[in-house]
Every structure is written in structure tokens, then in C-alpha cells.
Amino acid sequence: RDPEMSRGLGDVYKRQIQYFGDNLRPYWNREGNETIVSQFQKAEKEYKTQMKNSAAFDKKLMEEATAAGGRKYAELCALAYRQALAAHKLVQAPNGDLVFLSKENFSNGSIGTVDLTYPGAPLLLYYNPELVKATMNHIFYYSESGKWAKPFAAHDVGTYPLANGQTYGGDMPVEESGNMVVLAAAIAKVEGNADYAQKHWETLTTWTDYLVENGLDPANQLCTDDFAGHFAHNANLSIKAIMGVASYGYLADMLGKKDVAEKYTQKAK
């Protein structure tokens, strides 16, 4: 079957994602007053303008990437742009949050996986930090709603297209907690404020304390390379935990919590 046709048909359905029991429309039809036909008509009407905008964006991306690392690096960035954005669905949660959900295509179909969010984040941080938040909002909600009661970040929120709670059998406590705290700090760095972290401070504190207690010499845990299985004393996880604790200290400093910042920065060191 034609994958492009399948992708197009996916956007015809009125409610594509089930999010903790609520069936959500795609973002382009979040109010329920659009049709795929109206979108095709809009695309036809705006075709020349959007193609011009696309060409200008492509040119800018290649120029900036070439300046940063040369032509071969720029070509990798062009590939990475598509790769990082593929297999995501943008919806609006009932509480108004943007939610940008990934799908694992060649493993188990998990939706909203944190260790997929993390490596794709640099692209979104550069072009649209609000989309980084949108890749994190569902994980924060999962914990803060009480639906996920463990003291570390969840791995995912279900199996696409059902985002009703983690279905993957193996937690990644240090991996995902570290990822979430580091990403919160990256958002603060880019935006020049820690407002997003402040909104989720209690949850970030819980996850960071888990990293302090369990991250330096991790026990038998999975990491993002889960095909390797569980193993202890994972140096990569240890580094992830250290960076997570340091990131929390950085956020605390931005929020004026000087004693907290000093405490956690020293723990990271």
C-alpha cells in the first residue's frame, strides 16, 4: 500500500488520538469545523505562497547549517529535519495544552516516548520551543494527575493511537527522568526564563531526587538502547543522571532558589 496515501487518510478521521479517555481531533481541526476537503482547497489557494516560504526556509536552513559545520553537515541536518518531525501527531489536550505525540514505528508502537523526544529536541528548541513543551506535556500530566505514581518519569503514555497510559513493560527510570529534567533546563536556556520548569517544579524535584539516590551507579535498568536489555553500572545512565541533577540546579538558580541551586549543583559535581 502507498504509505503517503495511508498518512493522508489518517488525517481524514475526525478523532485520531485517544488521550486518557478523551478522543481528540487533529490540531488542524481542533474546533471540529474543518474538513479535509477544506484543507485541500486552502492548500491549493496558498500553494504558490507556501512553496515560496518553503524554498526560503530550505535555503536558510542549508546556509546556517553549512556555516556551522560545512556542506556534509548541512546535508545531514536536512535529513534530520524530516526524520525528527516524522511520525508525530499534534493535538490539543482538554486542559488546553499542546501535545505533540511521537509514534515508535519499528519497535512496539509506543506513543509519546520520552527517549524519542530527547534526541529530536535540538531541532524543536532551535525552531519552536513550544513544540518541545508539547512533547513533554503528556508526561508531566501523567504524573501530576496521579495516573502515574512512580517517583520517576514514565517511558511513554500508551500504544499509538491510544495514549491512555504506559503499555511498555520496561521502565527506564534514570533515562527518562534525566531526559525530562535536562529538556526543562534546555527550554529555560533558550527562552531566558524558567517559567515552564516552575509550573512543574514539584514533579521535577521528585524526579531529580530519584536521580540523586539512584543515578550515580545505576542498578539493573533499561536505557534508550533497550534492545541490549537490562544491565547495571551503565556509565551512560550515570552521566545522564549527573546532567539531570546539574540541570535542576541550573533551573533552581534561574528561579532564585539559591540554596537549592547550590545544593544540587554540588551533588552533580
Segments the model singles out, each with a brief description of its role:
Residues 1, 20-51, 109-218, 234-252:
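Aromatic-rich carbohydrate-recognition surfaces in CAZymes
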Residues 3-9, 13:
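Single conserved hydrophobic/aromatic residue that forms the stacking wall/gate
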Residues 15-18:
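Short glycine/proline/serine/threonine-rich loop/turn segments at secondary-structure transition edges
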Residues 37-108, 130-141, 147-149:
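Low-complexity, Ser/Thr/Pro/Gly-enriched N-terminal "stalk/linker" regions
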Residues 97, 196, 233, 260:
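Conserved acidic
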Residues 222-229:
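Short linear capping/connector segments at secondary-structure termini
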Residues 252-269:
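Carbohydrate-active enzyme catalytic cores, enriched for enzymes
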